[in-house]
């Protein structure tokens, strides 16, 4: 069947869809040029490069987080989970009969596991797509995978992904998970379809008040640590009414950009910093 005029998609699809002819690279590049390349975060553009052109239009992004029970950490005298060592220590201290020390992602066919695992690897300085592969990263890679085993061992049995980690954190059954900032509204009791079950009031913000967030954490081989981020793009397709698709994106990314981001402000961080007159 015919493709939509515009697809809102993640970074991982930009180059494969460009190479497969699904995206109209020329049309998307035209929009980026019209909006002004200097108005975009350079990293968002560089990752969407197909040859000399930008294959899709950057829209927004978010940074993954370690979400943790700040109150339990403080009560146990634990440091915040800013590195492998602190997380491992917290798992040992806070695991119990009714408390899993961590809820990791273990369902291998879920994209969520790729996100969490890559975050853990980057935290320890491991880059899977680095030129030359992982040959020179052997020690750091081994340490990262051993740490992930610690996270998995502290987790409940079964195949786990975002759904279980959120549900168990909301129920007060784990002190730590890795999640996106999209958890923030439901954490505060503002989403009917995914309320906290921490207490009897599904609209309570008690759990939110007891929660802390870490965006950058580190491993023993990378003391400065790293964050993991996801970027989303608009892609005009090969089947599109090109002129109308361009108009839609131009509006959504310019005078309508605040409205675009307000769809989910907790997880839609701007990647366009200004406009052509004030980049």
Which residue stretches match the model-derived regions?
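Extracytoplasmic/periplasmic solute-binding protein
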Residues: 50-59, 64, 86-133, 140, ...
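Short helix-initiation/N-cap motifs at beta->coil->alpha
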Residues: 1, 84-89, 158-171
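Hinge/lid segment of periplasmic solute-binding proteins
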Residues: 9-63, 88, 113-116, 202-217
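Extracytoplasmic "Venus flytrap"/periplasmic binding protein-like
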Residues: 1-40, 71, 75-82, 174-176, ...
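Glycine-centered hinge/linker elements that transmit conformational signals in sensory
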Residues: 91-95, 131-159, 202, 207-212, ...
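Loop/turn elements at helix/coil->beta-strand transitions in domains of secreted/extracellular proteins
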Residues: 2-5, 53-54, 96-101, 172-175, ...
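Beta->alpha turn/N-cap motifs
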Residues: 9-13, 162, 179-184, 232
């Amino acid at each position: 069947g015919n493709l939509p005029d515009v697809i809102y998609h993640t970074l991982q699809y930009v180059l494969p869809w460009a190479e497969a002819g699904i995206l109209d690279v020329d049309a998307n590049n035209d929009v980026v040029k019209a909006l002004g390349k200097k108005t975009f975060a350079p990293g968002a553009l560089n990752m969407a490069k197909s040859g000399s052109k930008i294959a899709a239009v950057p829209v927004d992004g978010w940074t993954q987080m370690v979400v943790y029970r700040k109150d339990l950490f403080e009560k146990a005298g634990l440091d915040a989970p800013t590195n492998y060592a602190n997380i491992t220590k917290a798992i040992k201290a806070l695991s119990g009969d009714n408390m899993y020390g961590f809820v990791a992602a273990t369902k291998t066919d879920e994209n969520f596991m790729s996100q969490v695992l890559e975050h853990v690897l980057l935290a320890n300085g491991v880059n899977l797509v680095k030129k030359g592969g992982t040959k020179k990263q052997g020690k750091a890679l081994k340490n990262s995978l051993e740490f992930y085993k610690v996270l998995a061992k502290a987790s409940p049995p079964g195949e786990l992904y975002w759904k279980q980690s959120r549900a168990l954190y909301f129920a007060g059954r784990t002190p730590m998970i890795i999640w996106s900032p999209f958890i923030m509204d439901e954490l505060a009791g503002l989403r009917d379809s995914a309320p906290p079950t921490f207490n009897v009031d599904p609209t309570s913000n008690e759990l939110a008040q007891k929660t802390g967030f870490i965006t950058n954490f580190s491993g023993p081989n990378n003391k400065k640590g790293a964050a993991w981020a996801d970027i989303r793009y608009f892609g005009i397709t090969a089947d599109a009414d090109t002129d109308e698709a361009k108009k839609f994106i131009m509006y959504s990314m310019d005078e309508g950009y605040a409205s675009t981001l307000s769809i989910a402000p907790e997880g839609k961080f701007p990647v366009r910093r200004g406009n052509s007159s004030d980049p």
